[in-house]
């Protein structure tokens, strides 16, 4: 049995399970755990008894929300399974985890086939130069069709995919697989816990098996130039020994992408995958170069200085803060000091854990290539690099930018600080969350990937921080301005028996497009003492902050005070501030005040079949198409300019229009005059709120 604490680098296999939500990634991991003897039963998500989906929200929703690690000792190897979410709202966590693996095993449903997230994550894996394999799951289900799914995989991902197992029967007739690599039939027992029964290939499957075998040899031969030439000119066939000796190289070089088939629920077809993971899937030293921030590269090296890359952090309610590390070089031991390249601070490692779901096991050391978990690294975040010298800094993968803004407030105003503290911690744990305070609208804005991520955030806040928060409508940061020059007097006089108040000023306001607020003193002959002029300026700015039409701050205005009068006893700063506010509002009555709405530019990426629908939808949102382009993958890029208020909920709307395949990037870009109907609606709402 392999040493789970510190296996040799070449005996580690880091496999990330990826694919569409519901394809069976977690059930594949649970089946591997059970078949290997790691767990006494197969955990299942649907009944809340999964070893890996243990979070309360995962149990409630019945799907994976974040990465869980499942280390499996199998023969002389340690397989680190990284079970990830297939939900688009949690793609950031999935992408970060993919950096820690040498192999991405895509799980595809035998009925639904490759779906939107399958395609998105496949492209990401290609960009990372991550080796890939496919497991076609649920082949025992009604309407399952192996040939159809293989055709879809070839059409979407190319011709380098090839089956290494072929089902013997489908749906209720599924009873085994053809092992194309070894050209044998493997029949299963009832529960998958004993070795498969090996027999000769049935005659009716001989032709399909030979076609798959020939294709396998064609692709694998490319891994050796000399053998390829002999093979292609027909002078030699690959021997079994040559095929098996080249297969790991072909997979690591992405020349061949193996496809397996089975059913996780009945634990069939699992042993073939696990055996090949150990024998042919790449080990950590096969990983390509890690790009460093200084432009150099580094590789997994057991003899190098101790260094690790943090791919995930979580706040565990029982253990505290946990950091998930992929060891890049050297050996880690408890009490070792490492320096965070981002902060320059030293962190002393306490315990080293091997995690299995939520269960932590202490280990005494960990070697390069392995995955380990360290508690209580207080200022460490996902994407950080820790090393003994502090000079190594691995470039983290750029993660998707969140585009879904919501406003959050505490259900009890007295608990606003608790909400803020929890949100700060949540952002540290999830790099696809953003939290900011909008000083104009006085709202806390959380920007996320989508609704499910926000709902999960609120549920965890209630569970972990014991505080409830609620969503409220996002206030759009409208502004107001003027379009004409106008003059008006502001006069304030108040007499109450003692010292009174008197202020009198004449103001001229005019548009100042794009230049902000400017104030000037044009008073002649001491009509207003110089010491009171700043009070006029303050009064104007206070009036602008309150707005004129609908309570939104006013911008881009020049204001000059050019005349007035004062009283030697009753004039003071307060009186002239009040007079200035009166005068400013009076001038606005004549200055053509208008409402400004924030505008956004968007690059929307969709497949051609949805381009027309999306363009039509943008028109209904008062948007304007400013151009189109295409991606290397043949998708359409639609460039638009649209009022920001019209696209607040765009993530879920685009997902609905494109069946989850569309994506976009948005930036705020200036302000435009709001149309009359929008202005009327906002003015009426403002007046009603004051009534």
Language model regions located:
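Structural and coupling elements of P-loop NTPases
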Residues: 1-691
């Amino acid at each position: 049995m392999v040493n789970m604490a510190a296996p040799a680098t070449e005996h580690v296999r880091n496999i990330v399970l990826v694919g569409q939500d519901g394809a069976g990634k977690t059930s594949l991991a649970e089946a591997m755990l059970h078949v290997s003897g790691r767990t006494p039963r197969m955990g299942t998500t649907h009944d809340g008894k999964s070893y890996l989906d243990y979070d309360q929200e995962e149990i409630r929703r019945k799907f994976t929300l974040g990465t869980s690690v499942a280390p499996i000792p199998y023969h002389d190897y340690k397989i680190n399974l990284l079970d990830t979410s297939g939900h688009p709202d949690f793609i950031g966590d999935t992408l970060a985890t993919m950096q820690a693996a040498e192999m991405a095993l895509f799980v595809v449903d035998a009925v639904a086939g490759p779906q939107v997230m399958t395609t998105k994550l496949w492209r990401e894996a290609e960009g990372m130069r991550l080796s890939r394999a496919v497991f076609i799951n649920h082949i025992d289900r009604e309407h399952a069709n192996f040939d159809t799914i293989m055709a879809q995989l070839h059409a979407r991902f190319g011709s380098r995919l090839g089956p290494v197992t072929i089902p013997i029967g489908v749906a209720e007739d599924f009873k085994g697989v053809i092992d194309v690599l070894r050209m044998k039939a493997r029949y299963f027992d009832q529960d998958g816990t004993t070795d498969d029964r090996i027999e000769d290939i049935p005659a009716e499957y001989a032709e399909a098996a030979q076609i798959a075998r020939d294709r396998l040899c064609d692709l694998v031969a490319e891994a050796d130039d000399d053998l390829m030439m002999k093979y292609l000119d027909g002078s030699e066939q690959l021997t079994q020994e040559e095929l098996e000796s080249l297969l790991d190289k072909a997979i690591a070089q992405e020349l061949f992408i193996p496809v397996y088939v089975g059913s996780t629920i009945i634990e069939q077809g699992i042993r073939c995958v696990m055996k090949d993971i150990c024998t042919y899937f790449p080990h950590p030293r096969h990983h390509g170069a890690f790009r460093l921030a200084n432009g150099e590269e580094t590789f997994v090296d057991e003899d190098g200085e101790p260094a690790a890359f943090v791919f995930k952090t979580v706040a565990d309610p029982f253990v505290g803060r946990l950091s998930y590390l992929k060891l890049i070089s050297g050996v880690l031991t408890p009490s070792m000091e490492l320096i965070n390249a981002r902060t320059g601070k030293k962190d002393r490692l306490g315990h080293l854990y091997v995690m299995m779901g939520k269960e932590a096991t202490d280990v005494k050391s960990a070697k390069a290539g392995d995955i380990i978990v360290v508690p209580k690294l207080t200022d460490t975040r996902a994407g950080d690099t820790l090393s003994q010298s502090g000079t190594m800094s691995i470039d983290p993968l750029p993660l998707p930018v969140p585009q879904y803004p919501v406003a959050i407030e505490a259900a009890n105003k007295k608990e606003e600080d608790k909400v803020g503290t929890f949100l700060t911690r949540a952002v540290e744990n999830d790099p696809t969350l953003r939290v900011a305070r909008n000083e104009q609208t006085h709202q806390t804005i959380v920007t996320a990937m989508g609704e499910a991520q926000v709902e999960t955030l609120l549920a965890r806040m209630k569970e972990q921080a014991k505080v409830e928060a609620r969503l409220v409508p996002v206030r759009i940061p409208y502004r107001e301005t003027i379009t004409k020059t106008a003059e008006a007097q502001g006069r304030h006089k108040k007499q109450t028996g003692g010292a009174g108040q008197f202020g009198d000023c004449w103001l001229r306001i005019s548009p100042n497009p794009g230049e902000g607020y400017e104030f000037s003193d044009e008073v002649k002959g001491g009509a207003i003492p110089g010491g009171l002029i700043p009070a006029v300026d303050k009064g104007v700015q206070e009036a602008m902050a309150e707005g004129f039409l609908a309570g939104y701050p006013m911008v881009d205005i020049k204001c000059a005070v050019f005349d007035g009068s004062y009283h030697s006893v009753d004039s003071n700063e307060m009186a002239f501030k009040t007079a200035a506010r009166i005068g400013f509002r009076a001038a606005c009555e004549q200055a053509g005040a208008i409402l400004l709405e924030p505008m956004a530019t968007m690059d929307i990426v969709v497949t051609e079949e949805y381009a027309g629908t999306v363009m039509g939808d943008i028109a209904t949102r008062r948007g304007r198409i400013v151009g189109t382009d295409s991606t290397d993958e043949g998708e359409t890029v639609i460039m638009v300019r649209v009022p920001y208020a019209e696209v607040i909920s765009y993530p879920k709307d685009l997902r609905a229009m494109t069946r989850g395949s569309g994506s976009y990037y948005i930036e705020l870009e200036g302000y435009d005059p709001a149309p009359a109907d929008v202005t009327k609606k906002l003015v009426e709402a403002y007046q009603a709120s004051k009534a």
